[in-house]
Amino acid sequence: MSTREGRLKDTSIRLSEATAADFFALLKPRVMALAVFTAFVGLMVAPGAVNPVIAVIAIAAIAIGAGAAGALNMWYDADIDALMSRTSKRPVPSGRVTPGEALGFGLVLSALSVMTLGVLVGWLAASLLAFTIFFYIVIYTMWLKRSTPQNIVIGGAAGALPPVIGWAAATGAVGVESLVLFLIIFLWTPPHFWALALFKVGDYAAAGIPMMPNVAGPASTRRQILAYALLLAPVGVLPWAFGFTSGYYGIASAALGVGFIWHSWKVRAASETELKPAKALFAYSIVYLFAVFAALLADTIAMRALMSVGA
C-alpha cells in the first residue's frame, strides 16, 4: 500500500493527543487572516449600510470557511508536507493530528460556515464560499497543485474570492468593484508564490510539486514574476480609475505598485544563486496586499465621513 493510499484510507475519527493549538494550526491562521481581511474590506467598501450583527456573522462564517479549507488542504497534502522542511512540522505529517481528525474537522467547519452564511446572511455569499472551498480543495489541492506549473495561476482564483464574498454578503450581488478586487489578488498570487518557490526550490522538488522554478527554470520564473508585477501595478490603481475611490487611494496604490515592480526587477536581475531579492519580494508582496486593501478601506471610510458631514 502506498503512502497516499494509506493516508486516504485512514479517515477514521480516532482520538489523538492533539491540543487546541494543533487544531488551530490546521486552520492555516496566517492564510486565514489574509482571506478574512480582504473579505472584511470587500464587505465594508460595498455600497449601502450593513447591519453590524450581520457583518460580524458574515466575517465569522468566512473565517470558519477559510479555516475549513486550510484543514482539508492539510489532510490531503499530508504526504507531501512530510517531505518539505517548511511544512513537515504541521499537525498531520508530524502525527499530532490524525488524518481522520483533520478531514472530519474540515468537513464540519465547511458545512457550518456555508450554512451559517446562507441562513443568516445570504445564499449568494454562501454559494460563493462553498465554491471557494471546493475550488481550493478539489481543483487546486487535489488536481492542479501536483499536475501543472500553472497551479498557482489558476488556483489563485480561490484566494482571490474573499472580497467578492464580502461584497455579496453586504449587497446580495456581485459588483464590478468586487471583481476589480478579485483581479488584484489574482494577479498578485503568482509573483508572491513564485518568489517563495525560488528560495524553496529544493523543498518543492523533494515533494514532486511542479512549481514554476522546477519546471521552467529560475530564469523563466524571474521573467514571469516581473511580467505579473507590470500587470498588477496598474490594476491596483483601477479602483481609483473607475471612480470607486479618491485620488489619495490612487497615489498610495501607485506607489505600492512601483515598489512591487522595483522588487520584481531586482529578482529579475539577480543571479540564479542570489536568493535575497526573492525573499525580499516575498515579504514585500505580503505588505503590498495588506497595504492596498487597508488604503482602500481607509479611503472609503474617509470619503463617507466627508459626505456625511456635507450632507
Curated annotation (Swiss-Prot):
Segments crossing the lipid bilayer: 31-51, 52-72, 97-117, 119-139, 152-172, 179-199, 225-245, 247-267, 281-301
EC number: 2.5.1.141
Catalytic function, reaction form: heme b + (2E,6E)-farnesyl diphosphate + H2O = Fe(II)-heme o + diphosphate
InterPro entries hit by this protein: Protohaem_IX_farnesylTrfase, UbiA_prenyltransferase, UbiA_prenylTrfase_CS, UbiA_sf
Domain of life: Bacteria
Pathway given in the UniProt record: Porphyrin-containing compound metabolism; heme O biosynthesis; heme O from protoheme: step 1/1
Note: Carbon 2 of the heme B porphyrin ring is defined according to the Fischer nomenclature.
Family: Belongs to the UbiA prenyltransferase family. Protoheme IX farnesyltransferase subfamily.
Protein known as: Protoheme IX farnesyltransferase 1
Record organism: Mesorhizobium japonicum (strain LMG 29417 / CECT 9101 / MAFF 303099) (Mesorhizobium loti (strain MAFF 303099))
